[in-house]
């Protein structure tokens, strides 16, 4: 398993928003922040709890959130205390 890079909540939120808006149909969607999953010891230790849809369709955003979490979760972990 490849090691992930630690990011602050602000950094990870920025990365997730950029990736989310790059997905088809999600140009106006955004997240407020990511949430730490405290009992997770390996792999992705964060989740996207809420998304502001903007003009995006929920079906497009659902697909995009799953894709973004999967892709960025392999690269980054959320640092515990900001």
Where in the sequence are the language-model features?
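Low-complexity, Ser/Thr/Pro/Gly- and acidic-rich intrinsically disordered stalk/linker segments
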Residues: 39-43, 70, 80
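Acidic-enriched, low-complexity/disordered segments with a strong bias for Aspartate over Glutamate
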Residues: 39, 55, 60-62, 81-82
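Low-complexity, compositionally biased segments
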Residues: 12, 20, 42, 63-65
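Short edge beta-strands and adjacent turn/loop segments
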Residues: 25-49
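A short interface-forming secondary-structure element
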Residues: 5, 47-61
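N-terminal acidic leader/helix
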Residues: 3-32
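Helix-rich interaction surfaces within compact, conserved domain-sized segments
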Residues: 57-76
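Short, charged, intrinsically disordered terminal tails
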Residues: 2-5, 73-82
């Amino acid at each position: 398993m490849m090691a992930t890079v630690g990011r602050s909540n602000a950094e990870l939120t920025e990365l997730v928003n950029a990736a989310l808006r790059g997905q088809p149909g999600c140009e106006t969607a955004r997240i407020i922040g990511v949430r730490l999953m405290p009992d997770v010891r390996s792999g992705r230790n964060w989740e996207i709890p809420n998304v502001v849809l903007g003009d995006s369709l929920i079906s497009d955003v659902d697909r995009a959130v799953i894709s973004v979490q999967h892709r960025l979760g392999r690269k980054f972990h959320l640092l515990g205390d900001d």
